[in-house]
C-alpha cells in the first residue's frame, strides 16, 4: 500500500506531529469522503506500507524527526515555485528557510528521494513566461 500524505493538505508543514504519532501507533482513521458516517481504520505498520509520499511546500517541521521514518520507504514531492507572498502568503521565506530546507532534506535522505515540483504555473502581467523561465533556472541552480 502506498500512502499519499497528502494532497488534501500539507501534512509535513502543518500536521507532522500528528503524522509521526499515527506512524508510531501504526494506524490512522479516515473518513470516507463520499459517506462521512463511514470511517476506515488503515494499518500503517511498516510491513504493510510499501511507501509514503509526502507532498509539501515546507518540510521544516519534519526535518529533525526523519529518523522516525527509517522503517519506511518514503519520498517527498516538494513544491517550490518562484511566486512571492502575493500568491503564497503563508510560505516562510524561500531564500532563508525553504530553499535551505530543500537542500538539507536532499542531503539528509538523498536527492533521489526528493522530487521537485514547480507547480502550479500560471501567467499574468507579473508572472510571465520569461519570469518563470528565469526563476526556474535560478531555483534549479541552487
What do the predicted segments below correspond to?
Residues 97-142:
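Conserved C-terminal portion of the radical SAM core fold
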Amino acid at each position: 500500500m502506498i500512502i499519499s500524505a497528502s494532497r488534501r493538505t500539507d501534512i509535513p508543514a502543518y500536521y507532522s506531529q500528528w503524522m509521526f504519532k499515527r506512524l508510531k501507533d501504526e494506524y490512522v482513521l479516515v473518513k470516507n469522503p463520499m459517506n462521512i458516517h463511514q470511517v476506515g481504520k488503515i494499518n500503517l505498520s511498516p510491513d504493510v506500507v510499501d511507501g509514503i509520499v509526502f507532498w509539501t511546500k515546507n518540510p521544516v517541521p519534519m526535518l529533525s524527526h526523519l529518523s522516525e521514518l527509517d522503517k519506511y520507504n518514503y519520498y517527498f514531492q516538494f513544491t517550490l515555485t518562484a511566486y512571492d507572498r502575493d500568491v503564497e502568503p503563508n510560505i516562510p521565506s524561500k531564500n532563508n528557510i525553504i530553499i535551505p530546507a530543500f537542500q538539507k532534506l536532499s542531503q539528509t535522505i538523498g536527492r533521489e528521494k526528493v522530487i521537485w515540483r514547480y507547480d502550479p504555473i500560471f501567467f499574468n502581467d507579473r508572472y510571465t513566461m520569461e519570469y518563470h523561465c528565469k526563476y526556474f533556472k535560478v531555483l534549479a541552480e541552487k
